[in-house]
């Protein structure tokens, strides 16, 4: 059976240079990040503004309205200033997840370093804007109202730990789901290949694994959208905390 982890290997395409003895390389991960950006840009540029929208325009409009509604629902009118930021994250995660389902491609969201970078970007955006807008009142985020004074220190400590752990949970959720799904697909696809190579008997035996591969691929499509949605709505919730701490 082929190694199911091999698909996640980061391989150097060409070396850009060295800084402090550290190689700076353009990798397959970098290439598929670029692919995700290009595909997203083409989707936005090729839509047009027809009165009767075509498929591409409909996809772009649905994506736009979905993100706008999500921000407005979770963060209110003030949250709309973050629309470009949230929309960019949503489209990047969605497109990269979908590209990764195509055989022999690379799933950038299956690497913790990528999801962690996005999660920390959200975390520091919330932190910086929270203090910029609210000053020291941002600390109200850690002091829930209506808590008895006796247990307040414990609650504050829990809230601080919860806040600091956000980048971890935010990144691991996306990374783990994409990693597990693609490993499962690879394992069953390998079964199909192995059984198919055994002749006519093996071909019949490969029917069930093949059916599972088709079903799992459909499930992965759902997971690709679902994880992009979860990552986006958590981003909006965290932004709401920066805008309205203590609410």
Curated annotation (Swiss-Prot):
**Source domain of life:** Bacteria
InterPro entries the UniProt entry points to:
ATP_synth_F0_asu (IPR000568), ATP_synth_F0_asu_AS (IPR023011), ATP_synth_F0_asu_bact/mt (IPR045083), F0_ATP_A_sf (IPR035908)
Name where it's found: Cell inner membrane
**Under the GO molecular function aspect, what terms does this record hold?**
proton-transporting ATP synthase activity, rotational mechanism
**GO cellular component terms, semicolon-separated:** plasma membrane; proton-transporting ATP synthase complex
Looking up Pfam families in the UniProt record yields: ATP-synt_A
UniProt keywords (A-Z) are: ATP synthesis, Cell inner membrane, Cell membrane, CF(0), Hydrogen ion transport, Ion transport, Membrane, Transmembrane, Transmembrane helix, Transport
Q: Give TM regions.
A: 24-44, 82-102, 112-132, 141-161, 194-214, 219-239
Membrane topology term reads: Multi-pass membrane protein
Function description: Key component of the proton channel; it plays a direct role in the translocation of protons across the membrane.
Instruction: Tell me which family the UniProt entry assigns to this protein.
Output: Belongs to the ATPase A chain family.
Q: How does it assemble?
A: F-type ATPases have 2 components, CF(1) - the catalytic core - and CF(0) - the membrane proton channel. CF(1) has five subunits: alpha(3), beta(3), gamma(1), delta(1), epsilon(1). CF(0) has three main subunits: a(1), b(2) and c(9-12). The alpha and beta chains form an alternating ring which encloses part of the gamma chain. CF(1) is attached to CF(0) by a central stalk formed by the gamma and epsilon chains, while a peripheral stalk is formed by the delta and b chains.
Which protein, by its recorded name, is this? ATP synthase subunit a
Taxonomic source organism: Nitrobacter hamburgensis (strain DSM 10229 / NCIMB 13809 / X14)
- Which gene specifies this protein's sequence? atpB
């Amino acid at each position: 059976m082929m190694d199911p982890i091999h698909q996640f290997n980061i391989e150097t395409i060409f070396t850009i240079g060295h800084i402090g003895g550290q190689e700076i390389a353009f990798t397959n991960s970098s290439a598929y990040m670029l692919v995700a950006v290009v595909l997203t840009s083409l989707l936005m540029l090729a839509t047009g503004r027809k009165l009767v929208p075509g498929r591409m325009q409909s996809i772009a409009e649905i994506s736009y309205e979905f993100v706008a509604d999500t921000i407005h629902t979770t963060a209110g009118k003030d949250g709309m200033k973050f629309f470009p930021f949230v929309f960019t994250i949503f489209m990047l995660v969605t497109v990269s997840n979908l590209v990764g389902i195509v055989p022999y491609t690379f799933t950038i969201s299956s690497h913790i370093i990528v999801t962690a970078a996005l999660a920390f970007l959200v975390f520091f955006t919330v932190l910086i804007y929270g203090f910029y807008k609210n000053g020291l009142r941002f600390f109200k985020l850690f002091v829930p109202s209506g808590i008895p004074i006796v247990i307040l220190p414990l609650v504050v400590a829990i809230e601080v730990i919860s806040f600091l752990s956000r980048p971890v949970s935010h990144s691991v959720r996306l990374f783990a789901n994409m990693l597990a799904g693609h490993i499962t697909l690879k394992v069953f696809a390998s079964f199909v290949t192995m059984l198919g190579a055994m002749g006519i008997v093996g071909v019949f035996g490969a029917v069930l694994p093949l059916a599972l591969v088709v079903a799992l691929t459909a499930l992965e499509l759902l997971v690709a959208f679902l994880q992009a949605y979860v990552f986006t709505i958590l981003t909006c919730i965290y932004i709401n905390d920066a805008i309205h701490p203590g609410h």
